[in-house]
A protein has these predicted regions:
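Short, T/G/N/S-enriched strand-turn elements that build extracellular solenoid repeat scaffolds
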Residues: 1-24, 30-41, 53-65, 77-93, ...
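Long terminal segments
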Residues: 32, 164-200
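Terminal non-domain segments
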Residues: 41-61, 66-78, 82-84, 184-200
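Intrinsically disordered, low-complexity regulatory/activation regions of eukaryotic proteins
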Residues: 73, 90, 180-182
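Extracellular beta-strand repeat scaffolds in secreted/surface proteins
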Residues: 73, 147-149
Length: 200
């Protein structure tokens, strides 16, 4: 007996008896630890473990294991957590204090106040011209997507000590503004009446 199957979408293959965790990222923190069991946890995308406060010894003692295409681990947690993933998982080790931003990011003063100076961005980054002084404050920047910035900021951008990104795109210059008709000096010999000009 033969059968045909048409799949409209994508197919995800996961290990037998795994606990399927939905979402684009799963954070391993002390809240996760409260409910953790001696099970294999699987996610289609990635696990994040960047909070140094996570009690990794307690997590490992519960018999947890994890499986996903990628895992982002801060350096201090990696020695204990890395063995809990299979060899097929790509392990990305980041410095302690790194904030993982799960969206596009515009580098502004408020963004640095919120996330700090060590950033791992799962998306694109835009650096406006007015943020030139902020680049010197960035210690680590990893961007999975593109970076858009003015050409004059390129040297300061590449001076970031720990830098990794995709394509760098320069902002297109704005087209010169055309003078408005209202801004033109009126001709003293011309009178405008309801849209019609009469030359005297």
């Amino acid at each position: 007996v033969s059968a045909r199957c048409i799949l409209n979408g994508k197919l995800a293959v996961y290990p037998d008896d795994a606990v399927l965790l939905p979402g684009s990222s799963i954070k391993l923190d002390n809240t996760f630890l409260l409910r953790a069991q001696s099970r294999l946890y699987w996610n289609e995308h990635r696990f994040l473990a960047v909070d140094p406060r996570l009690d990794t010894a307690a997590l490992a003692a519960k018999g947890c294991s994890f499986s996903a295409p990628k895992a982002i681990l801060c350096a201090s947690l990696a020695p204990v957590l890395a063995p809990l993933f299979p060899d097929s998982t790509e392990l990305i080790i980041v410095p302690d204090g790194t904030a993982v931003v799960e969206d596009d990011l515009e580098l502004t003063a408020s963004a640095l106040r919120r996330y700090g100076s060590r950033l791992y961005v799962l998306g694109d980054v835009t650096i406006p011209a007015e943020s030139a002084d902020l680049l010197a404050r960035v210690e680590s920047l990893h961007v999975t997507g593109e970076v858009q910035l003015p050409e004059e900021l390129e040297d300061a951008f590449y001076a970031i000590p720990d830098l990794e990104c995709g394509k760098v795109v320069h902002e297109a210059p704005l087209p010169p503004e055309m003078p408005s008709l209202d801004d033109e000096e009126p001709d003293p010999d011309t009178v405008t009446l309801s849209g019609f000009q009469l030359t005297l």
